[in-house]
Amino acid sequence: MTHQAHAYHMVDPSPWPLTGAVAALLMTSGLAVWFHFHSTTLMALGTVLLLLTMYQWWRDIIREGTFQGHHTPPVQKGLRYGMILFITSEVFFFLGFFWAFYHASLAPTPELGGCWPPTGITTLDPFEVPLLNTAVLLASGVTVTWAHHSIMEGERKQAIHSLTLTILLGFYFTFLQGLEYYDAPFTIADGVYGSTFFVATGFHGLHVIIGSTFLAVCLLRQIRYHFTSEHHFGFEAAAWYWHFVDVVWLFLYISIYWWGS
């Protein structure tokens, strides 16, 4: 191995960006094929390829950062900046949905009956399942912070327990959201109300699933002694992402469920 006189990580050539891009193409085009031709083959292929890419890319990063020592302080600083910029881009992504919602609701057109919610729409009670979901996500924010402090203090078992609890709360939120969708008195096809509701809450739900997966990988890594009290950026990034998902839900709850109903 050649001597490296700097602290930066010179990344080896990797096939995973290419396979990830192909998986994304197959999934998005597969979604369109599913909607129009009722065939899920292309989307299933994309999903399988995406899962394989995720597994192998994460495996490579864990090898480089945990076992080969490539994640030096300057590299970790770069990763932190990257995660902050990624979350900032996600903020603007959700800002688009809130903009669409408020554009439609603050000045409802005559086609909507000049009122919000539009004429004929029966809304969900914000003080039933949505309020429970809010409590579940806020509790998960507490447990993920507990996990973070446990890792920093070297309390391995506490970290495992609190992280497991966070993941279970995440899956419980997803389950409740699925029930709510199933029982909703309106659909995504019910005009601007249905589309803004399901697209905004649906993308948030997708982010909860992604965050739960992220935390599940961190749990496996914690069980296998990958984290130390000083070196655990993988978990830190997952915790930041989870807090972001929490905050987005609070805005969704106040805007769409409570004020919008």
UniProtKB/Swiss-Prot annotation:
InterPro entries: Cyt_c/ubiquinol_Oxase_su3 (IPR024791), Cyt_c_oxase_su3_dom (IPR033945), Cyt_c_oxidase-like_su3 (IPR000298), Cyt_c_oxidase_su3-like_sf (IPR035973), Cyt_c_oxidase_su3_a-hlx (IPR013833). One of its GO terms (cellular component) is mitochondrial inner membrane. It comes from the Eukaryota. Its main location: mitochondrion. It is found in: Mitochondrion inner membrane. The chain crosses the membrane at residues 16-34, 41-66, 73-105, 129-152, 156-183, 191-223, 233-256. Residues 35-40, 106-128, 184-190, 257-261 are mitochondrial intermembrane. One of its GO terms (biological process) is mitochondrial electron transport, cytochrome c to oxygen. Its EC number is 7.1.1.9. The keyword Transmembrane applies. Signal peptide: none annotated. It holds the Pfam family COX3. Keywords: Membrane, Mitochondrion, Mitochondrion inner membrane, Translocase, Transmembrane, Transmembrane helix. Residues 1-15, 67-72, 153-155, 224-232 are mitochondrial matrix. It catalyses: 4 Fe(II)-[cytochrome c] + O2 + 8 H(+)(in) = 4 Fe(III)-[cytochrome c] + 2 H2O + 4 H(+)(out). CDD domains: Cyt_c_Oxidase_III. It is an enzyme of class 7 (translocase). One of its GO terms (molecular function) is cytochrome-c oxidase activity. The keyword Protein biosynthesis does not apply. It is a multi-pass membrane protein. Component of the cytochrome c oxidase, the last enzyme in the mitochondrial electron transport chain which drives oxidative phosphorylation. The respiratory chain contains 3 multisubunit complexes succinate dehydrogenase (complex II, CII), ubiquinol-cytochrome c oxidoreductase (cytochrome b-c1 complex, complex III, CIII) and cytochrome c oxidase (complex IV, CIV), that cooperate to transfer electrons derived from NADH and succinate to molecular oxygen, creating an electrochemical gradient over the inner membrane that drives transmembrane transport and the ATP synthase. Component of the cytochrome c oxidase (complex IV, CIV), a multisubunit enzyme composed of 14 subunits. The complex is composed of a catalytic core of 3 subunits MT-CO1, MT-CO2 and MT-CO3, encoded in the mitochondrial DNA, and 11 supernumerary subunits COX4I, COX5A, COX5B, COX6A, COX6B, COX6C, COX7A, COX7B, COX7C, COX8 and NDUFA4, which are encoded in the nuclear genome. Belongs to the cytochrome c oxidase subunit 3 family. This is Cytochrome c oxidase subunit 3. The gene is mt-co3.
